[in-house]
Amino acid sequence: MPGASRTIVVNAPIEKVFDVITQYEKYPEFLPEVKGIRTENRKGNTVDVHYKVDVVKTISYSIHVTEERPTRMSWSYIKGEFMKDNKGSWVLEPEGEGKTKATYTVDMALGALVPKSVVSALVETSLPKMLDAFKRRFEAP
């Protein structure tokens, strides 16, 4: 999944979008593939986030997140199953009255045993579905 990036414009102010992105424990409420999530080691604007996600099979991984309110959230890989690396970001920009341009970028290196078809499915299917779920959450009253 090298260099996968998508941009959406949402009908929500930048602060709300940032809040949704950084309320990690609420992800299972609107992202059905997230089966469990917990945070630890919060220090200022950084936190470690531990995921359990179901993509073909259930895998666990951990990332170190840096939050730059209200315009950016980025992460780097700590450890995980079937993964060699996972880094990326959300970059937020005001887009007119009450709207936000949100760009999601991820660079993920999966293990050699992971079939290319799984990697393609993640990019072509999972990423758009995830962004649609975030958009609905951003725009919810």
Which positions does each model-derived feature cover?
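A general secondary-structure boundary signal
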Residues: 7-11, 58, 76, 89-91, ...
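Hydrophobic ligand-binding cavity/cleft-lining segments
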Residues: 1-44, 129, 133, 140
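Ser/Thr-centric signal marking residues that sit
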Residues: 22, 100-103
